Amino acid sequence: MRLAASIAVALPVIGAASAQGFPPPVTGVTVVKSKYDENVKITYKENDICETTEGVRSFTGHVHLPPDNDYFGVYQNYSINTFFWFFEAREDPKNAPLSIWLNGGPGSSSMIGLFQENGPCWINDDSKSTTNNSFSWNNRVNMLYIDQPNQVGFSYDELTNITYSTINDTISVADFSSGVPAQNLSTLVGTGSSQKPWATANNTVNAARSIWHFAQVWFQEFPEHKPNNNKISIWTESYGGRYGPSFASYFQEQNEKIKNHTITKEGEMHILNLDTLGVINGCIDLMFQAESYAEFPYNNTYGITAYTKEKRDAIIRDIHRPDGCFDKLAKCREAAKEGDPHFYSNNATVNAICAEANSDCDKYLMEPFQEANLGYYDIAHPLQDPFPPPFFKGFLSQSSVLSDMGSPVNFSHYSQAVGKSFHGVGDYARPDVRGFTGDIAYLLESGVKVALVYGDRDYICNWLGGEQVSLGLNYTGTEAFRKAGYADVKVNSSYVGGLVRQHGNFSFTRVFEAGHEVPGYQPETSLKIFERIMFNKDIATGELDIAQKQDYGTTGTESTFQVKNEIPPSPEPTCYLLSADGTCTPEQLNAIENGTAVVENYIIKSPAASKGNPPPTTTSSPTASPTAGSAMLKAPVAMLAISALTVLAFYL
């Protein structure tokens, strides 16, 4: 084994994105005990790890909820220690609104959004230093990044010794009573969560119940946030297409119960004044979005053809056949309505029916796309995709960073326990009580702004499906929204960043030249859209006050499909040790496993990878690469024993 001098041989790296050895002892944290419950507390630490703007404060910490409670309406017998990272606004934080940011998964850390998309800093390719992000979303808004549900990212239930395989991207519980095992590039050690699938929320609605309790504690008792503006927004991404509508509608329902005195328990009566729900490339409802998985790989604005028209037509037929995807989704939803109406996922029969529906839909929707060897999150990129750069994983591996954060656990970008728990009950196949599109309609009727924002190169939660969701809502503004045309999103005097359909508080935006993580591709465009929505301006120009003009509607074309895009150059390949399964070739994976890889700052320098083939178009043939594809897919699928759709679709 050869390691570059920049990585100490004695300090391994850990986690599905994680840390150099065990975390250092936690010191210097402030402890705030709840005035409502002696068993609840907040621990936190102020630091300048990412936000280095003079005078702008940031804090990392945990909200600790004890076991033996019925927070979810079902007995919860595990500790919940939910991690947060709070950044004050760079401009007038006392009067700035606040937005929560949640990545999806289920099981993905919100550090993905913070460091790859919209946080105050970018991580440089040395995985050690940072560069200021001038398009950070905390320019004018207080930002609260949360790792949820329990066991995601820096959140944990109980501190547990673990090993991590960089080859398979898997975490295993370890017994170190006889000593810590030898470590190398492929096998690392650290401290994580218990990895018990039952020690976390097991579905979207239970996650909503959990995050509401977190919010009750944080917004009432975190002493460093005392704003004059008490409005709260939720922005989210990917599987957040389910999180966002469910969480926001649950918050709104709880607000109503507090107002009518249905909720009277001390410490749980803080009204969370919802302002905006923003969803970026959200997978919201498979009933609305399923056909887009067949259509988008063949028919998109880049001229990329992952497969033929005949294959597309066959997929459509398969999902509509008797006892196919749509039939099984309908059966799942009917069973859930009868057997688990409040979405606790405690009915084994319902869980099995919905898990089968999820698996069947995957078979016909996802598997044909795998053969094209294209990026799930960017169809113009190869399957082994180095963008957005994964350097934050090495950054969060540093002992000094973990110490400054006050974290007792190593970082992991994805929780296997959460993935297993959600997928085992068929979460993606079923809606919540109102339905996720119904949740959006409910929020709009309640006066909450809702923005759907989609990058136009993402396959996994693509904009064609997102547009169908936007047109399928049933609320009082439905017809007016559908009649609104698409207008240019004017980012600056020389650049149009996308097209938006907007009526009043509801909008759908297609962002040009962006994959799944839109702010990582188009930071200026994303910031403009975010701030215009947050401050009640029209998305197209940012000049009109929507609060004073609630009947505002965009004018323009009925469709955006006439606006075509050029295929960008493929990114230079970068095999990154802490993202090996998604960025490295089979040859590089073998070198990591046998210890012959040359590594510098987590980047495999040798063996080097060659640039992949350009994506197939209408004038070329698909270039399938089953070997490379299997290198990406084998670990998560084998590890979770679940469908490729549920593993890959929502890693972010």
UniProtKB/Swiss-Prot annotation:
Glycans are attached at residues 77, 132, 161, 168, 184, 202, 260, 299, 347, 410, 474, 492, 505, 594. InterPro entries: AB_hydrolase_fold, Peptidase_S10, Ser_caboxypep_ser_AS. The keyword Signal applies. It comes from the Eukaryota. Keywords: Carboxypeptidase, Cell membrane, Disulfide bond, Glycoprotein, GPI-anchor, Hydrolase, Lipoprotein, Membrane, Protease, Signal, Virulence. It catalyses: Preferential release of a C-terminal arginine or lysine residue. Extracellular serine carboxypeptidase that contributes to pathogenicity. Belongs to the peptidase S10 family. This is Carboxypeptidase S1 homolog A. It comes from Trichophyton verrucosum (strain HKI 0517).
